[in-house]
């Protein structure tokens, strides 16, 4: 990742500064209006937007929660430790974690040099990616089930693709586009996500796909 972009993402946010100043927990009002800790797309995405990004909040334990949108977590530098179904899932630099709307997870405190991006995505954003990836393969079918299912079952996918240069370049392009906010690039970003899906299909040997309540791989492909 370009140093200038990484430096931009490393800047301490107002929320993080309050934590450093002594606020010991996440301010849930920034994320949800309800009693149940479900992060709300209405608070995270501007009206009419299908996708947005924000840096993961460091220096604090992020308590168990889920989202009413799709979350894709990408670690730019360092690592991030999630707890899903009682199991530690460590995401290292260059890796991706897809979480559907029903997956509850908590995140252990990240340090200053642990830089992660949360992609907050409404399901319809993936329509172009579905078209590009097709449906005649196991991974594409699994992605469809994870990302668009009506059944309230938490699932996640962990892609260890730090060495796949094409995926890293595409992710950097999309992060830059969303961070700078230059123009309405929904279509470009949807197509970029479609290309990422295509490369993920070529990289299934690096994928771990699990149900949070199971400790074994749900499916293994090489």
Language-model features and meaning:
Residues 2-21, 40-42, 50, 110-176:
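A hydrophobic/aromatic-rich effector-binding and dimerization subdomain
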Residues 79-81, 97, 101-106, 125-127:
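Histidine-centered metal-chelating micro-motifs
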Residues 86-101, 109-111, 115:
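Short acidic-glycine-tyrosine-enriched beta hairpin
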Residues 63-66, 70-75, 88-90, 96-97, ...:
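His/acidic/aromatic-lined binding-pocket segments of jelly-roll/cupin-type domains
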Residues 1-79, 137-141:
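Generic protein-terminus/edge-of-domain signal
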Residues 156-161, 178-191, 198-222:
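Short, Lys/Arg-enriched, Trp-marked, Pro/Gly-tolerant hinge/linker segments that flank
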Residues 60-67, 108-110, 130, 185:
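Short histidine-centered beta-strand/loop micro-motifs
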Residues 71, 166-173, 192, 199:
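Amphipathic, well-ordered alpha-helical segments in soluble domains
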């Amino acid at each position: 990742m370009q140093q200038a972009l990484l430096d931009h993402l490393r800047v301490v946010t107002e929320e993080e500064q309050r934590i450093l100043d002594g606020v010991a927990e996440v301010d849930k009002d920034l994320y949800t209006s309800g009693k149940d800790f479900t992060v709300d797309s209405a608070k995270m995405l501007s009206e009419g937007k299908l996708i947005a990004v924000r840096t993961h909040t460091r220096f604090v334990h992020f308590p168990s929660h889920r989202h009413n949108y799709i979350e894709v977590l990408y670690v730019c530098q360092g690592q991030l430790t999630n707890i899903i179904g009682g199991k530690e899932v460590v995401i290292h630099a260059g890796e991706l974690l897809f979480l559907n709307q029903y997956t509850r997870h908590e995140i252990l405190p990240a340090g200053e040099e642990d830089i992660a991006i949360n992609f907050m995505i409404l399901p319809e954003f993936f329509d172009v990616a579905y078209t590009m990836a097709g449906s005649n393969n196991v991974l594409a079918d699994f992605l469809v089930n994870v990302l668009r299912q009506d059944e309230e079952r938490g699932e996640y996918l962990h892609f260890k693709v730090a060495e796949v240069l094409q995926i890293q370049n595409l992710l950097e392009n999309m992060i830059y586009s969303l961070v700078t906010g230059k123009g309405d690039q929904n279509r470009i970003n949807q197509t970029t996500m479609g290309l990422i899906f295509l490369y993920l299909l070529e990289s299934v040997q690096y994928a771990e796909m699990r149900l949070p309540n199971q400790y074994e791989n749900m499916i293994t492909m090489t």
